Amino acid sequence: MQIILSILEWIYLNVRYFLRKGKNKQESLDVIKHAEMKNINDEERFIFRRMAEGDMEAFRFFFEKYYVDLCNFVNIYLNDPATAEDIVQDVYVYFWNKKENIHIETSIKSYLLKASKNKSLNYLR
């Protein structure tokens, strides 16, 4: 388990590095895609179940854990940090409002990344 956590931490740090260093958009997206193809873990599954039952602390956990990464990810598409934050907030509002009906097969983060990407592309249309 410790090895898996170390690998995930390494992936996370590398994703952050690519985003900060301004590598080309596709390279950054490929790193994120590779990092997020993991299945939902037991901790996230438990916290997500609590959130689906209306627990705001569980929602706050996901918000605080992924907010910055999602904003950076959306900003790749929009190149506008303020609009990126608005889109991520909209994604979280949707996530909270539909919590009882959402079925996540991969990780929570990959679900939020996909929702953020879709909302960003809709914004650009």
Name each model feature, range by range.
Residues 52-61, 71-90:
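Short, charged helix-capping/linker segments at alpha-helix termini
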Residues 73, 94, 119, 123:
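Short alpha-helical functional segments enriched in proximate histidine and acidic residues
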Residues 59, 63-66, 71, 92, ...:
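Conserved hydrophobic/aromatic "anchor" residues
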Residues 86-93, 106-118:
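Structural recognition of an alpha-helix C-terminal capping motif at a helix-to-coil junction
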Residues 100-103, 117-125:
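Arg/Lys-rich amphipathic alpha helix in sigma70-family domain 2
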Residues 65, 77, 86, 114-115, ...:
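Conserved catalytic core of Hanks-type protein kinase domains
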Residues 52-53, 79, 90-107:
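Sigma70-family region 2
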Residues 1-68:
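N-terminal module of bacterial RNA polymerase sigma factors
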